[in-house]
């Protein structure tokens, strides 16, 4: 409830609406407080609690090399190209939770789908790869350096479906990725 951010607010509202419509909803997330906090500092305890009527299952975030991430991220912010190794470092040293990805892969049959929002985070990237056939993406896509990463292309092209928040967002995705076979809303 108290976590700021546009994508977080959108997901919170979506969860409440789905729950109100009678769907079983559970949020899978990390123990990190918010986007602006230290991504390797686990503030919340791992486990499940009910927040605003919706179960929230939290997983420990991994430690990370912030300086290495910041070096690559600075280049991406300036729309500079990065090597495949730097791209892998970007996803690896961003906010991550191997426990979360193992849970998704090991409990996929317990869920109808996994909704990932927004696109450029380690939790989205590795979460989609853990179970692409049940992954839905709400990308919040912008024409920025992150959008041009091959790993981002990979998840856009592997997910079961994509929900775009605007027509320009969908048009950008169509220009950047091969999403013709992906269900879109």
Describe the function of each predicted region.
Residues 1-57, 109:
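N-terminal subdomain of nucleotide-sugar transferases
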Residues 33, 120-123, 168-170:
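Alpha-helix capping/helix-boundary segments
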Residues 67-122:
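Conserved nucleotide-sugar donor-binding subdomain of glycosyltransferases
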Residues 110-120, 124-143, 163:
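Active-site proximal beta-strand in glycosyltransferases
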Residues 126-130, 150-154, 176:
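A short acidic, amphipathic alpha-helical/loop segment
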Residues 135-140, 146-160:
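A conserved, positively charged/aromatic
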Residues 143-147, 159-184:
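A short, active-site helix/loop in glycosyltransferases that binds the activated sugar's phosphate group
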């Amino acid at each position: 409830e108290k976590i700021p951010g546009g994508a977080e607010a959108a997901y919170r509202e979506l969860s409440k609406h789905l729950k109100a419509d009678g769907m079983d909803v559970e949020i899978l997330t990390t123990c990190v407080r918010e986007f602006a906090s230290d991504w390797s500092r686990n503030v919340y305890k791992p486990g499940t609690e009910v927040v605003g009527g919706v179960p929230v299952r939290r997983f420990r975030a991994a430690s990370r090399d912030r300086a290495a991430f910041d070096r690559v991220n600075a280049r991406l912010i300036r729309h500079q190209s990065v090597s495949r190794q730097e791209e892998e470092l970007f996803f690896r040293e961003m906010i991550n939770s191997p426990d979360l990805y193992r849970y998704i892969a090991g409990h996929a049959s317990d869920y109808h789908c996994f909704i990932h929002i927004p696109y450029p985070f380690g939790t989205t990237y590795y979460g989609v790869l853990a179970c692409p056939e049940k992954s839905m993406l709400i990308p919040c896509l912008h024409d920025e350096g992150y959008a041009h990463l091959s790993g981002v292309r990979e998840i856009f092209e592997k997910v079961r479906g994509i929900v775009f928040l605007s027509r320009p967002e969908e048009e950008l995705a169509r220009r950047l990725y091969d999403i013709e076979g992906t269900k879109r809303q």
